Amino acid sequence: MAKKVAVLAVNPVNGCGLFQYLEAFFENGISYKVFAVSDTKEIKTNSGISLTADDVIANLKGHEDEFDALVFSCGDAVPVFQQNADKPYNVDLMQVIKTFGDKGKIMIGHCA
């Protein structure tokens, strides 16, 4: 059975970590979809490179059953999370992580 992974990318994201995940999934035939933890699909890496994610985290809510695992790709947005915790996309982030956890799904991530 094919596996499918939801990849969360904060804004800004650690591009090195994100691309290591994506390359590993690609090379191993694992399907994935990248969700920006943002109001828009357009995000940046810590070094300022612009990226376009597949979708935004708000659209992952309610679709957790379509994925076997959740991968969290950290970045410079995390150290200032407390200042932005009330933003809708960060509220969605916490809800999605909780839902994946409640369903006993695999969750991994990194912070660098």
Describe the role of every protein-language-model region:
Residues 1-103:
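Extended, subdomain-level signal for the structured scaffold at the beginning of enzyme domains
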Residues 106:
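Active-site cofactor/cluster-binding pocket
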Residues 109-112:
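Catalytic nucleophile serine of serine hydrolases
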